[in-house]
From Swiss-Prot:
Name of the molecule in the record: Cytochrome c oxidase subunit 5
Annotated function: Component of the cytochrome c oxidase, the last enzyme in the mitochondrial electron transport chain which drives oxidative phosphorylation. The respiratory chain contains 3 multisubunit complexes succinate dehydrogenase (complex II, CII), ubiquinol-cytochrome c oxidoreductase (cytochrome b-c1 complex, complex III, CIII) and cytochrome c oxidase (complex IV, CIV), that cooperate to transfer electrons derived from NADH and succinate to molecular oxygen, creating an electrochemical gradient over the inner membrane that drives transmembrane transport and the ATP synthase.
Family: Belongs to the cytochrome c oxidase subunit 5B family.
Signal peptide as annotated in the record: none
The species this protein was found in: Dictyostelium discoideum
List of residues binding Zn(2+): 76, 84, 99, 102
PROSITE patterns xref list: COX5B_1 (PS00848), COX5B_2 (PS51359)
Amino acid sequence: MSKIVKFLKELATPSHSMEFFHKPASNSLLDASELNFVRRNIKREDFGHEVLTGAFGTLKSPVIVESIFHSRIVACEGGDGEEHDILFHTVAEKKPTICLDCGQVFKLKHISSEGEVMYY
């Protein structure tokens, strides 16, 4: 095969294959494990909660965020039909956190062990 043909094939072939996006690296056992859980639709405990759902949080009735830690990061994308870009907030035990974009209120509930975490 001539050098020109090889060069043209390299130009036409993407630098990655689509398999890159679907298969973990062969030396990454954790990635393979995560992929198997996703394929079988099994929830792994070490990933934590999937999504917090419920009513829009207000000062009188905030969204309760459970955690075995003293703070947790939550993502807010709005509510009540008015969505906004995702904003990430650190919710701590001391006081409720209010989203500056939509006004939704989040409050951390510290729990003593992993066995007490609610699943949504």
